[in-house]
């Protein structure tokens, strides 16, 4: 036990350096594994058996939005219930990102799953007060129509488009793609924004024929299950890939920088649990769908079950995360600097572990045998 405790302290030291990011982290992180950066040994080091060794035993307060970015988190609760989670979790759901932001800034939350561009903006506004730990969702946006008049971007000219996500991913992705397809988003179309995707689906349900909207999964699936006349006309992920060579990223998971510095061992334990939760979301569709309904992420399990395979739920951390997010933010910045808070975030924005972490993890694993 003493040997294991010493190694946990060494792990905490390594992670505290990583949490600071910067030149020290960047110089040693280039060879770190991406999705494998938190190996199985971390689970052993931060298991419930060793919970007393963690820097805090308080429940980890993490917020998410109703929809795809939180679908990868729900299995944390089942893991906690069956005793396989490394931590206790307080998962809080909100309808809009602007409900999460003040709580995160005030320290009422430890982590949150939010849009990628919002994370960059918050990093600027808080002077480095948050860091991004993982990509959680890739492209999930679609243009849908209640009719049969839209077959390409050109058909959107002169039309009204209902959308959610003003100031976040839906707005900037839509505007970017409109411009790339020869349309001025301020002149050639009218975009009406709503706070939540559920409001857009309600508007579409009540709308006349030929209404158009931008919706994410699982709301596309939910709307189509209620209205068979609603059809997908444009997959915005495919459209993005057609004109851009970067990965379209919808959501990321962030942590307060202060929390990460104080509790690096908890971060390691969380990332291990999180990777398992995402794996379960992609493999145990029935179980995850039931949890989505139980928690309130999606209204009905049947909707979640049908939508989950289309939600592009992922776990990407380390250097792969940094590469994908930085490239995506560069595209947004080039189109509109305001989209990422006026300037691109520096290296401290990315919570990445130095490659030496793997050696510490290996030592912990060997000592636990």
Name each model feature, range by range.
Residues 1-11:
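Positively charged n-region of N-terminal signal peptides that target proteins for export
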Residues 19-32:
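Bacterial lipoprotein signal-peptidase II cleavage site
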Residues 38, 44, 49-193, 214-217, ...:
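Short, glycine-/small- and polar/acidic-enriched structural segments
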Residues 75-77, 141-152, 247-265, 314-317:
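A bilobed periplasmic-binding-protein/Venus flytrap-type ligand-binding module shared by bacterial periplasmic
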Residues 326, 330-369:
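Conserved C-terminal helix/tail region of periplasmic/extracytoplasmic solute-binding proteins
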């Amino acid at each position: 036990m003493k040997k294991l405790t010493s190694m946990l302290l060494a792990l905490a030291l390594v992670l505290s350096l990583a949490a600071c990011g910067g030149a020290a982290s960047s110089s040693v992180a280039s060879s770190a594994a991406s999705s494998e950066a938190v190996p199985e040994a971390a689970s052993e080091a931060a298991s419930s058996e060793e919970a007393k060794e963690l820097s805090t035993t308080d429940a980890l307060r993490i917020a998410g939005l109703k929809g795809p970015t939180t679908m990868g988190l729900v299995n944390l609760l089942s893991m906690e219930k069956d005793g396989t989670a490394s931590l206790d979790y307080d998962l809080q759901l909100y309808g809009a990102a602007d409900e999460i932001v003040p709580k995160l800034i005030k320290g009422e939350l430890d982590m949150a799953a939010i849009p990628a561009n919002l994370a960059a903006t918050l990093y600027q506004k808080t002077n480095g007060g948050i860091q991004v730990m993982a990509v959680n969702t890739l492209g999930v946006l679609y243009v849908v129509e209640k009719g049969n008049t839209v077959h390409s971007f050109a058909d959107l000219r002169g039309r009204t488009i209902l959308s959610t996500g003003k100031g976040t991913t839906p707005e900037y992705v839509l505007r970017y793609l409109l411009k790339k397809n020869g349309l001025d988003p301020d002149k050639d179309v009218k975009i009406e924004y709503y706070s939540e995707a559920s409001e857009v689906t309600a508007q579409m349900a009540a709308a006349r024929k030929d209404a158009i909207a931008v919706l994410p999964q699982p709301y596309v699936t939910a709307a189509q299950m209620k209205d068979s006349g609603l059809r997908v006309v444009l997959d915005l992920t495919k459209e993005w890939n057609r004109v851009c060579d970067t990965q379209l990223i919808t959501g990321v998971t962030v942590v307060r920088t202060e929390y990460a510095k104080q509790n690096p061992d908890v971060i390691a334990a969380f990332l291990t649990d999180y990777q398992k939760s995402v794996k379960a979301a992609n493999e145990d569709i029935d179980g995850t769908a039931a949890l989505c309904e139980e928690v309130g992420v999606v209204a009905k399990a049947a909707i979640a079950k049908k939508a989950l395979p289309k939600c592009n739920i992922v776990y990407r951390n380390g250097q792969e995360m940094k590469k994908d997010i930085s490239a995506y933010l560069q595209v947004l910045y080039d189109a509109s600097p305001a989209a990422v808070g006026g300037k691109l975030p520096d290296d401290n924005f990315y919570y990445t572990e130095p490659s030496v972490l793997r050696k510490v993890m290996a030592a912990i694993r060997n000592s636990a045998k």
